[in-house]
UniProtKB/Swiss-Prot annotation:
GO terms for cellular component: host cell mitochondrion. Plays a major role in antagonizing the type I IFN-mediated antiviral response. Acts cooperatively with NS1 to repress activation and nuclear translocation of host IFN-regulatory factor IRF3. Interacts with the host cytoplasmic sensor of viral nucleic acids RIGI and prevents the interaction with its downstream partner MAVS. Together with NS2, participates in the proteasomal degradation of host STAT2, IRF3, IRF7, TBK1 and RIGI through a NS-degradasome involving CUL2 and Elongin-C. The degradasome requires an intact mitochondrial MAVS. Induces host SOCS1 expression. The gene is 1B. This is Non-structural protein 2. A motif (DLNP) lies at residues 121-124. The DNLP motif has IFN suppressive functions like binding to host MAP1B.
Amino acid sequence: MSTTNDNTTMQRLMITDMRPLSMESIITSLTKEIITHKFIYLINNECIVRKLDERQATFTFLVNYEMKLLHKVGSTIYKKYTEYNTKYGTFPMPIFINHDGFLECIGIKPTKHTPIIYKYDLNP
């Protein structure tokens, strides 16, 4: 009798531990996968070559981020993700500094679910 009870308890524990990831966890992990040193380098290169102002650079950052996201997760998940981001304002936004007219992206502003991330802390 006690073996059956222990077995049932163990099954219940396994079921609760296997719950799906929350949207916040998915957003955080996707952001870390997409925004890397290479991604920031490409944004900074665009800023220098095209001499973008901060508004244009932010737009370029978001377009590139969303294209990588769409390519990575597909259109169905992308739609859910962007609806959530629009509702809760969790899009990653860049931090720029100005070097005599040339912008450099040095990191990502904190959002509801992620802390401030500097480019030196990103994956290579």
